[in-house]
């Protein structure tokens, strides 16, 4: 009976007694894929409107086995990156240029949008890609909060100095008549 491959990481599952003289190499390949799935990093250039992360049974050169994926390149149209349709998770750094949208999805499934210049914690159930922090709710931070874009309040309040600490508050005008 020949080797088979695991569905999530494409690890080679050797049959007992198979691969005499080469089982060590095959085992090392499997260990390298496990290492990539836990701590691996790969940079992938987005070249077209639909790109697939490479995947290989038993090999160690596939892109999708890596935990961290940096997407680079210049988008020339709305694009989608796809991985295999299996359960997995990724940290994705969208470092592409161009003003087009970029989605990430399992093959044949539903994409999640990747915000330009942002890092995303993603997981897929094999049919839909999810951005874990997209709907995260309350966020607590220690230190200075810097916002590059607009801050919107939709039905919520804005509380200054909730802990009654001795802090200063300042609003500065940009010179417009209304502030």
Mark where each language-model region is.
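The right-handed parallel beta-helix/beta-solenoid scaffold, focusing on the short coil/turn
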Residues: 67, 79, 88, 98-102, ...
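Exposed extracellular interaction/assembly regions and N-terminal maturation sites
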Residues: 2-102
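Short, surface-exposed secondary-structure edge patches
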Residues: 28, 80, 111-113, 142
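Intrinsic low-complexity, repeat-rich intrinsically disordered segments enriched
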Residues: 17, 45-52, 107-111, 127-179
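Short, surface-exposed beta-strand/turn "edge" patches of beta-sheet domains
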Residues: 103-117
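Extracellular disulfide-bonded cysteine-rich modules/repeats
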Residues: 24-29, 116-126, 168
